From Swiss-Prot:
Catalytic activity: uridine(38/39/40) in tRNA = pseudouridine(38/39/40) in tRNA
InterPro entries (alphabetical): PsdUridine_synth_cat_dom_sf, PsdUridine_synth_TruA, PsdUridine_synth_TruA_a/b_dom, PsdUridine_synth_TruA_C, TruA/RsuA/RluB/E/F_N
Catalytic residues as annotated in Swiss-Prot or TrEMBL: D51 (nucleophile)
Protein name per the record: tRNA pseudouridine synthase A
This enzyme's EC code(s): 5.4.99.12
Membership in a protein family: Belongs to the tRNA pseudouridine synthase TruA family.
Binding site for substrate: Y109
Biological-process GO terms, alphabetical: tRNA pseudouridine synthesis
Organism: Nitrosomonas eutropha (strain DSM 101675 / C91 / Nm57)
Domain of life (superkingdom): Bacteria
GO molecular function: RNA binding; tRNA pseudouridine(38-40) synthase activity
């Protein structure tokens, strides 16, 4: 049988999702826990192979097993064996032709960026940071040039193993709440470091180093060396994976960090002002 899981994790303590020799990965931790429950070796496949330091709010994985266990064992049992920074949220049996990676039609990533002179304390490792002020309107204008199907060679890493750089970016929304910026990227698939490389360029534009039209130049040149440096992984989250309705997977409502950020920020500001009266 084939089982599908949805999990969330804090990526700070790992070399990334994928197993690597002599390094700790999210995949290796999950496979170890599931193998103990099944009393046999389990290998998992993920929808997205997140990099070191990148988090997931809704990672989808599948695995095959001949062992019969209640679905609760794959959730509660796994969570009892996993470290605190990885949590299985949901499990279900799925048809044998389902594939967590290749059946996915769309992936969504969120990036949370703090823009202020002082580095983050409470949100250290959970949000990116720049000490520069950013122009939201300029970044939004630049983002519109990226929507659609393009050759994203200027925004792929040198280590990217994809056969070509053609990707379709469906949505790139940028919003601001106080000192926090939220970037939402949605595409059929992403190249290695694509989100963080685009983010680096948008931040340069927000700082005023380049005009929004610079994005068009980068797309046309297809040269990674002309673009901005790869930005920090700290604020990047795999937030959702979409599948065709025939797989009968649920629409999973994740806890969006900006809601938590806004709640904490609102409480902090109200307490500070109350103390000054």
């Amino acid at each position: 049988m084939k089982i599908v899981l949805i999990l969330e994790y804090d990526g700070r303590g790992y070399c990334g999702w994928q197993k690597q020799p002599d390094r700790i990965s999210v995949q290796s931790r999950l496979e170890s826990a599931l193998s103990r429950i099944a009393s046999s070796q389990i290998q998992v496949v993920a929808a997205g192979r997140t990099d070191a330091g990148v988090h997931a709010l809704c990672q989808v994985v599948h695995f095959e097993t001949h062992v019969i266990r209640p679905l609760t064992a794959w959730v509660r049992g796994a969570n009892a064996l996993l470290p605190d920074d990885i949590s299985v949220l949901w499990a279900s049996e799925v048809n044998d032709d389902f594939h967590a990676r290749f059946s996915a039609t769309e992936r969504t990533y969120l990036y949370y960026l703090l823009s202020r002179p002082a580095r983050p304390g409470i949100f250290q490792g959970k949000t990116g940071w720049t000490h520069y002020s950013l122009d939201l309107e300029k970044m939004q204008t630049a983002a519109r040039f990226l929507i659609g199907e393009h050759d994203f060679s200027a925004f792929r890493s040198a280590e990217c193993q994809a056969k070509n750089a053609i990707r379709k970016l469906v949505r790139l929304d940028i919003s601001q709440s106080e000192q926090f910026f939220v970037f939402e990227f949605c595409a059929n698939a992403f190249l290695h470091h694509m989100v963080r490389n685009i983010l680096g360029a948008l931040i340069y534009i927000g700082q005023g180093k380049y005009p929004p039209e610079w994005i068009q130049i980068l797309l046309g040149k297809r040269d990674r060396t002309l673009a901005a440096p790869t930005f920090s992984p700290d604020g990047l989250y795999l937030a959702g994976v979409r599948y065709d309705a025939r797989w009968n997977l649920p629409t999973f409502n994740v806890i969006r960090p900006e809601n938590v950020i806004n709640m904490i920020a609102s409480f902090k500001y109200s307490q500070n002002w109350a103390g000054l009266r």
